[in-house]
Amino acid sequence: MTTGFLQKIFGSRNQRLVKQYQKTVATINALETQIEKLTDDQLRGKTDEFRQRVAAGESLDKLLPEAFAVCREASRRVLKMRHFDVQMIGGMVLHYGKIAEMRTGEGKTLVATLPVYLNALAGRGVHVVTVNDYLAQRDAEWMARLYNFLGLSVGINLSGMEHDQKQQAYAADITYGTNNEFGFDYLRDNMVYETDARVQRALNFAVVDEVDSILIDEARTPLIISGQAEDHTELYVRMNALPPLLERQIGEEKADGTGVEKPGDYTLDEKARQVFLTESGHEKAERLLAEWGLIGEGESLYAPQNITLMHHVYAALRAHTLFHKDQHYVVQNGEVVIVDEFTGRLMAGRRWSDGLHQAVEAKEHVKIQSENQTLASITFQNYFRMYAKLAGMTGTADTEAYEFNEIYGLETVVIPTNRPPKRIDKQDQIYKTAKERYDAVIRDIRDCYERGQPVLVGTTSIENSELLSHLLKQVGLPHEVLNAKQHEREAAIVAEAGRPKRITIATNMAGRGTDIVLGGNAEKQAAFIEADDAIPADEKARRIQKLHDEWETLHEEVKAAGGLHIIGTERHESRRIDNQLRGRAGRQGDPGSSRFYLSLDDPLLRIFAGDRVRSIMDRLKMPEGEAIEAGIVTRSIESAQRKVEARNFDIRKQLLEYDDVSNDQRKVIYQQRNELLEAHDITETITAMRHGVITEVVRQFVPEGSIEEQWDVPELEEALRNDWQLDLAIQEMVNESSSITAEEILDAVMTAADEQYEAKVAMVGRESFSAFERSVMLQTVDRLWREHLAALDHLRQGIHLRGYAQKNPKQEYKREAFELFAAMLDAIKQEVTRIVMNVQIQSPEQLEEAAEQIEERGGHLENVEYQHADYADAGAPVANVTAAAAATATADMVGSAMTHSGPGGEMPKVGRNDPCPCGSGKKYKQCHGKLS
């Protein structure tokens, strides 16, 4: 109450910020007359003037009014678009590293040019991040005209580009690209063998378009570069026969033995998307697997030799019971393609993790592709937090403002609209069954069609969009279907969705990023005419003018009919996605309306609010076909959505807490890798490793400060001979001297090791041997880091069970991950020392050839996939793109094959006396800095 009273007097923080920015807008507007008088060359010359002032120490904040005024004038001349005052406010919000919430149609693409231009003046690079290649290319080509006019270079970073093209794109002042590609480039940069092979510069400033989609919706799905692991294809096929033989149990057994309505072999938890075998289910599965010869007679599924079979049993069960064709995936060209649950788009190339995708392939009887092994991974949360400054824009961020602030430290500012919104959001209508709901939707669509009002119908799955399409065909209503199956036609369909009588069905936010203009998009049609060289210039002008005249008539016709009408066929689990659908109507002050039609069969209502609403309907004795339309029900649904949002936030936060552990370790490894790449000579590092390893070996058989009776000299001699190629007569030394000490034995072994090393260096020269050492070191670090990631995955999967032992799983994970990391560092030292000590050199040429072989293979990777997988639950998508620019290093003389990949950003350095980022409390030099 007090807060509300104070807000009335002083305004909310959002209002105060907007008012503060309006003062700066007044300053910019005052400069407009002066800037308008400049010639094109003088306007372009302002960029060089600004750059010199920045180089001389002037801050970007101080430069902002002039730079924004110049950018606005350039946009007016080149793009024929002048930034509105509210767009200037949006630009300031982005420059100050915040999130700008701007309604659909308010010109977010144009807003981004202001902070991008200003920050590009510093010369450290600016990244503009979009959700797909189409938008990245469209925006880059569109805005490049403005930036090039002002003397700035623009690069586009797309998937599948050549290495040289990527380097050029990142070297530009401004780089447009997708979130996936920026993240994968970072991982690849930290898998290269030469500093010249990197593509990214330091991560300076990023403007993220559709920031909610990238930093919230996709935050649970890490980017993963993986290679093929062991093949279990046949096992998936055999396991696919199991689920149809098992029956679902209805109801959960309570402590008193009641609650089970129908006994069965497994139970489903739809909220958690998990399936569990019951006791009878275990027995039945074991009996069937024994009959098929997959386990021994009378053996348990939990026997050590059968534990991997459990993974396959549950993968097959989940594939059959929780993942459904045309809802969660489609089968296309003999492949299982995931459908994005947020946008309804097909995610070609992405794969589910934990063997789920292979199980679904077995279920659909298509070719089963092999499982993968992680080579490198990072979450978007940790990738984007590495930028020195981060900003974002979207039409719907306010509902997630707390999460943006909590996870990323980003404040959300709601930008006022240029014109007051006129959209009417009607109350939800709730029906008992899906049939009644669809009947009501068809009635509403028919009514709009007869009045000439365009309709956009939002569905949550391909299955629902095709069902609705079938119903519309039955009643003879012409329509367009915009779902993942029509991806190529998406932009064209959306552009025309505002024409009179146009009916468009879209899965969730398909077509996001393209405006729906009332009356249709004349600009797009005009562009086609402009691009047709067969049409004479005067004919082009006549046709384009005719187009614009027709558009004016249609535009007024649609406005008179009420503008675009939005129909939602069910509520999404996130209010934000619902708001995005509504936001397609009422752009730039146009009229519009929206309404959601729900049924008690909808997953959200069934799981979270169904019983309450059903009891209300029963008490009111609602006849068939009658809808509830009441605030209390709408509030009940929004309450259910808030519960789901809170649960999803907890999942993302928990994922981040776990991922922070591996992220800190990743920083250490990548920093040390970069230091290795940049060092001219790593002799000191190799020598320190050798001394440490040899000391450990000797101490194992001749403990420090011990007496002769405690020594095991024959075993020491054998270990040195077999593992380190050191043939020393230590027993003779002991026999000849009655007073020899453990320290003297260590010195003798160390001297022999140093001499052997120096002899190899002398044979080929310091430079050649150092290049070989660097290659070996990088190959070993990468291979053991890859194995460490797999170990962390396994640790993660079972760590929740520690809770049953009254232990904190997060603390246990942190402790054990630290122990695994320390063991990995020791293994790196052991492995590198062993290879360098054992390498047999015949000639300098042979050594150079070996080093080149490692590096060449380190720059090319076969059978590599780029995945966007979900650790949090195996039902999340994994992107797999066969790699052109990733890496394998395999050298017979060095050890087992390792898989690798291209380019990366710079890590913030950790000082040697700073606390170690792993959280152990020790200094970095005494902890994970030991390797350097």
Curated annotation (Swiss-Prot):
Keywords noted in UniProt: ATP-binding, Cell inner membrane, Cell membrane, Cytoplasm, Membrane, Metal-binding, Nucleotide-binding, Protein transport, Translocase, Translocation, Transport, Zinc
Could you tell me the EC number(s) of this protein?
7.4.2.8
As one GO molecular function, the record gives: metal ion binding
Cite the binding residues for ATP: Q87, G105, E106, G107, K108, T109, D515
Cofactor-binding details, from the entry: May bind 1 zinc ion per subunit.
GO CC annotations on file: cell envelope Sec protein transport complex; cytosol; plasma membrane
Predominantly, its location class is: membrane
Q: Which reaction does it catalyse?
A: ATP + H2O + cellular proteinSide 1 = ADP + phosphate + cellular proteinSide 2
The protein's topology relative to the membrane is: Peripheral membrane protein
Q: Does the keyword Nuclease apply?
A: no
CDD domains the record matches: DEXDc_SecA, SF2_C_secA
Any one GO BP annotation for this protein:
protein targeting
Cofactors per UniProt?
Zn(2+)
Which InterPro entries does the entry mention? Helicase_ATP-bd, Helicase_C-like, P-loop_NTPase, SEC_C_motif, SecA, SecA_CS, SecA_DEAD, SecA_motor_DEAD
* Entries under Pfam families matching the protein: P-loop_SecA, SEC-C, SecA_DEAD, SecA_PP_bind, SecA_SW
Annotated Zn(2+) binding lies at C916, C918, C927, H928
Q: Which family does it belong to?
A: Belongs to the SecA family.
Query: Which NCBIfam families does this UniProt record tie to the protein?
Result: PRK12904.1, secA
**Role according to the record:** Part of the Sec protein translocase complex. Interacts with the SecYEG preprotein conducting channel. Has a central role in coupling the hydrolysis of ATP to the transfer of proteins into and across the cell membrane, serving both as a receptor for the preprotein-SecB complex and as an ATP-driven molecular motor driving the stepwise translocation of polypeptide chains across the membrane.
PANTHER family reported for this sequence: CHLOROPLAST PROTEIN-TRANSPORTING ATPASE, SECA INNER MEMBRANE COMPONENT OF SEC PROTEIN SECRETION SYSTEM
Q: What is this protein called?
A: Protein translocase subunit SecA
